């Protein structure tokens, strides 16, 4: 009986550790994407979609990101629910909230070369945050879930060229 209690305690501690990693990774990724978005050099495809939704429907960037992610999560749930776990949902809630928080406190230079380095820092932080989140192994992000759901159900290969 003691072994069972100890095992459950270890599992709970491991889960809590992973959830903390997801939250930290989400915060770092959100800060990174916010730096990159507002540096003034344009954005990636999804960031442009978020900006368009935000302007069209008078939403914040974080809320637009959340709306797109919910749509992708719903698609992945219908198409291949094995891609979605607690980490998928937790990441998106923390990430979208933090994007809105960080968007209110960004300060940029009038020098484009300096903003370029801010954008690079943002991309690096986004990658680090995403890596942290992924290392917890508690579900894919909404965008990755759709990619892997489509790939696995259709026998497509996801690879680096």
Each PLM stretch: what is its role?
Residues 2-161:
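Core subunits and conserved enzymes of cellular information-processing
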């Amino acid at each position: 009986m003691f072994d069972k209690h100890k095992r459950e305690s270890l599992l709970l501690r491991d889960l809590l550790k992973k959830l903390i990693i997801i939250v930290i990774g989400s915060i770092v990724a959100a800060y990174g994407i916010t730096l990159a978005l507002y540096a003034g050099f344009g954005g990636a495809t999804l960031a442009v979609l978020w900006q368009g939704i935000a302007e069209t429907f008078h939403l914040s960037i974080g809320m637009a990101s959340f709306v797109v992610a919910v749509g992708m999560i719903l698609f992945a749930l219908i198409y291949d629910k094995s891609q979605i776990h607690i980490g998928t949902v937790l990441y998106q809630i923390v990430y979208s909230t933090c994007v809105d928080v960080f968007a209110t406190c960004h300060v940029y230079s009038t020098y484009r070369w300096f903003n370029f380095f801010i954008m690079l820092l943002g991309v690096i932080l986004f990658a680090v945050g995403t890596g942290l989140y992924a290392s917890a192994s508690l579900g894919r992000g909404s965008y990755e879930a759709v990619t892997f759901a489509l790939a696995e159900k259709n026998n497509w290969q996801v690879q680096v060229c």
